[in-house]
Amino acid sequence: MELVLKDAQSALEVSEATFGREFNEALVHQVVVAFGAGARQGSKAQKTRSEVRGGGAKPWRQKGTGRARAGTIRSPIWRSGGVTFAAKPQDHSQKVNKKMYRGAIQSILSELVRQERLIVVEKFSVEAPKTKELLSKLNGLELSDVLIVTSEVDENLFLAARNLYKVDVRDVQGIDPVSLIAFEKVLITADAVKALEEALA
């Protein structure tokens, strides 16, 4: 299959397996959920009644005071007491094998092509790290909410986009399923398309 280059009167021959695959919603959902789960810090920690400082002595005798019986001031029903089911640090990451991950990325790329949200250009760069220059180029392509994918990290492009809302710059190694679906359009260079094909082959 072919992808038309926006800035040139030509087309790029690409793999049907990478850019013409049927959309697998269940697979994409699973991989996106796993990606989000892996990003969780998982460091929340609370103390149980046995871990809270103090509470060794019985606050008052068992009988005769008229008050409810109590054995420790660190009971979960007391103020400053321990937490009944205390949260502990945990790993939220989910296992996703390489074949599934590649399949999800291919599925997303294919759907972007079908929805005409993937824009391919021969080259895309800025002379200097100037936001105004990048904004001018994006306006020329009628793009505002866009992920820019290049084959290698372009420092000028990265710095120019850093202060723009709904604009992000990634190299091929830096893309992930969430970033691909988070933006309205994906602008990708021809070199990045070839690099993606090799990575997903």
From Swiss-Prot:
Highest taxon listed in the record's lineage: Bacteria
Region of interest (Disordered), ranges: 43-66
GO cellular component, one term: ribonucleoprotein complex
Keyword Methyltransferase attached: no
GO molecular function: rRNA binding; structural constituent of ribosome
BP GO terms, sorted: translation
Keywords assigned by UniProt, alphabetized: Ribonucleoprotein, Ribosomal protein, RNA-binding, rRNA-binding
NCBIfam families xref list: rplD_bact
Subunit structure comment from the entry: Part of the 50S ribosomal subunit.
HAMAP family in the cross-refs: Ribosomal_uL4_B
Function: One of the primary rRNA binding proteins, this protein initially binds near the 5'-end of the 23S rRNA. It is important during the early stages of 50S assembly. It makes multiple contacts with different domains of the 23S rRNA in the assembled 50S subunit and ribosome.
Family in the record: Belongs to the universal ribosomal protein uL4 family.
PANTHER family given in the database record: 50S RIBOSOMAL PROTEIN L4, LARGE RIBOSOMAL SUBUNIT PROTEIN UL4M
Protein name: Large ribosomal subunit protein uL4
